[in-house]
Amino acid sequence: MDEFHRYGKEDNSRQQCFLYPLFFQEDLYAISHDHYLDGSSSSEPMEHLSSNDQFSFLTVKRLIGQIRQQNHSIVLFVNCAPNPLADCKKSSYSESVLEGLTLVLEVPFSIRSKYSGMNEWKSFRSIHSIFPFLEDKFPHSNYISDARIPYSIHPEILVRTFRRLIRDAPSLHPLRSVLYEYRNSPENLQRSIIVVPRVNTRFFLFLWNYYVYECESILFSLLKRSSHSRSLSHRPFPQRTHFHRKIKHIIIFSRRNSLKSIWLLKDPKIHYVRYGERSIIAIKGTHLLVKKCRYYLLLFRQCYFHLWSEPYRVCSHQLSKNCSSSPGYFLRVRMNPLFVRTKMLDELFIADLITNEFDPIVPIVPILGLLAREKFCDVSGRPISKLSWTNLTDDDILNRFDQIWRNLFHYYSGSFGRDGLYRIKYILSLSCAKTLACKHKSTIRVVRKELGPELFQKSFSKEREFDSLPFSSKAAARSQRERIWHSDIPQINPLVNSWQKIQDLKIENLFDQ
């Protein structure tokens, strides 16, 4: 890869990036073929490859020549099912072409990242920064937007995005042909879209990451100007010299027939967080500045990505401060005003600070609705057996129920009023017992007698909830007064999948109307 990077630099790739000759270098496909054989480009099994599968670079070059002719009737993926994005068997040649195309496209992107100003954007690249973001930015923001970058992207949008990065048109022809070949499937033909990250290949992961990079780059100019300090609503300050720096960022507008002054910030404070395809933008500022930022983000994004031709565009709507759905679960929020009085030395100055305190609450009713939707209980909250899991082993059933409870408790560990979670625990434990009883065609009492009463205590033990806390001995007394966000929250379970399906269905219904 270093050799290809040097090749791009010698040709002044930052200004005129001619990458098409790289497609006909055998070293490129040697690297891509090794990636394909090692399974590093995909998480799918490679059982369809035979040991005597001879790879010919001449065949690959012929495929590149066919792509150059822009004949969309050519079947590039000869061994694929009607839907290439499904679990199908791809030939080694088509995989090598995709790997080679990915390696070529990564060259200008890596060179651009060295010169781009995005390197100055110091962000927290961890999912665990979401909860500090909610605690610090939610209470002090005037406008909170919940944006959704769809996984379904039109091929032409990706091609036009890469056109800003790659100067030579022949390099874009293979990309356009491959994208439209993937689009021409029975499921994607009506919508004319391409589902990017559903298949865990290096090619589609690169396309998705690059598309997200371009979406976030339009925020860089605003984020660079915005202040990252915590916003507090202050009372008017007296004229004192040691507040000169703070007063520089404040403008005084006096009203007629009023002795009060309105204190406004010059620049709005913009905070951004993303998890998967969903992102949250929090803006702090005046009503006019917030309105300008909203129009800037929406209109500039549409013009930048030509989103008027995309049926499933980037969806953005105002998010209430009383709820949040990131990352996947549902969280209710209660804002409590907090008054703080500060005093300087010798009692020369006293200032009253008014701020909001972020108090997350466990939403019991929505969680019960999700449990009822997934057939763990009925609509009234009465536990029922999970019939779809009766064909699993006893250990798998216990582990699945235990994982759901552990993820729920860890996610809401930083919330107040966690007593309602024990009702959820009771529903899950009894549903687990009924599932095992239904599997063995017996009763709950017989299952407990055969498997042992300690079996459910190990899976749903009360002590393990505080095993990771440094003060486990005093956790029971301090659990209601302290918030601790656990670090193993990004786990996949049926509740998160069900919640995401509900949200995606609501968004699709909005566009279909």
Curated annotation (Swiss-Prot):
One of its GO terms (biological process) is tRNA processing. One of its GO terms (molecular function) is RNA binding. Usually encoded in the trnK tRNA gene intron. Probably assists in splicing its own and other chloroplast group II introns. It is found in: Plastid, Chloroplast. It comes from Pinus parviflora (Japanese white pine). PANTHER family: MATURASE K. The keyword Isomerase does not apply. This is Maturase K. It holds the Pfam family MatK_N. HAMAP family: MatK. Coiled coil: none annotated. Belongs to the intron maturase 2 family. MatK subfamily. It comes from the Eukaryota. GO terms for cellular component: chloroplast. Keywords: Chloroplast, mRNA processing, Plastid, RNA-binding, tRNA processing.
